[in-house]
């Protein structure tokens, strides 16, 4: 793993402290930046997440993904599901399902509780499956 340092120019290009490049796949990068705006997730009329402190995770071969601090997510109707996945660039993922008045929305949210060492620290952040929410960002 190599960490590169990148400096932007001007007020619209924040300084990126670290861009992770993986030795086992040269050219593959993962990095985060602060989200440029307030982020919200709604399911039906329920506000599930609302933050001004979100992150955008950029990863080679993927679209950018918004991550929300866990403290800004309403966990009261979320339940840990049985689904887990593994990403060689970020680590093992656990998923959460949302209990609603009409049933469950399965695996609506994911979390990397212990990201691999090379990954930016997203252990206190969660992501959402955009196709399963009614309104976002």
Describe each region flagged by the PLM.
Residues 1-137:
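Terminal leader/tail segments of proteins
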């Amino acid at each position: 793993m190599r960490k590169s340092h990148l400096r932007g120019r001007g007020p619209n290009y924040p300084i990126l402290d670290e861009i992770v490049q993986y030795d086992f796949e040269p050219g593959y990068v993962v990095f985060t930046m602060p989200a440029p705006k307030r982020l919200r997730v709604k399911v039906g009329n329920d506000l599930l997440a609302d933050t001004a402190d979100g992150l955008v995770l950029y990863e080679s071969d993927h679209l950018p993904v918004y991550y929300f601090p866990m403290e800004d997510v309403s966990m009261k109707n979320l339940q840990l599901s049985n689904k887990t996945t593994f990403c060689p660039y970020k680590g093992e993922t656990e998923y959460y399902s949302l209990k609603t008045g009409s049933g469950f929305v399965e695996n609506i949210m994911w979390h990397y509780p212990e990201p691999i060492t090379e990954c930016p620290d997203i252990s206190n952040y969660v992501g959402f499956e955009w196709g399963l929410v009614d309104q976002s960002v």
